[in-house]
């Protein structure tokens, strides 16, 4: 006969209890001593940096953490593109991106949006590629040195 597994409760998990939002969960009448670790109920959590979010108890037990600290969700003033990389956000093309703004996305977002450099070149690429250092393709093609130019410099230095 198979051995019966003993139920584990939220209160048995010290890491989850450290992030359990007592005030908000009490309002929902959630008791960590009654709710099991596999529960699909959405509880409130607060990470060590003070970010608050809702997630199922089961997903938290499986290892999901703060969506803001991990960059899965955008928190304006904390992990948004405008805050993380204002130099890149400065080239945001507000006209072509409509309602999308740099503070709506994390710097690691793979969303493809429009950009406009100081010379007026417009192009589309992902936010994370810009944050990783990819700049304006129009400006980079203007800066390319041709083989004959390299040859002239080489012979002049001899």
Give residue ranges: language-model regions.
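Functional cation/ligand-contacting sites centered on basic and imidazole/sulfhydryl donors
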Residues: 1-158
